[in-house]
Amino acid sequence: MDKQHQNKTPKLHIGSLIKRELEKQERTVSWFARKLCCDRSNVYKLFKRSTIDTELLLRVSQILHYDFFDFYKKELCE
């Protein structure tokens, strides 16, 4: 990987995008935590994260029926 690629900071904040979609769907943090099998506090921590593990992102995408990977696909095209 070249230096230009290594120093590139992510433009998107995945936690904020997940939070926005959850609110758009009018779902509660409690509902989302139950679906993820975790505590509400972990959901709030997720909202603050700028990066995410792909397996977790897949689970989130399935739960919310929303392709969050699409944001990363768009980043690749820029």
Locate the predicted segments by residue.
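A short, Lys/Arg-rich alpha-helix, primarily the initiator
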Residues: 1-27
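Key DNA-contacting residues within the recognition helix of helix-turn-helix
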Residues: 19, 44-45, 72
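Residues within the alpha-helical elements of helix-turn-helix
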Residues: 24, 35, 63
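Short alpha-helical "recognition helix" segments of helix-turn-helix
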Residues: 31-33
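Recognition helix of helix-turn-helix/homeodomain-like DNA-binding domains
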Residues: 37-52
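Short, basic-rich loop-to-helix N-cap that marks the start of a DNA-contacting helix
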Residues: 49-62
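Short C-terminal boundary/hinge segments that cap the last helix of small helical domains
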Residues: 65-78
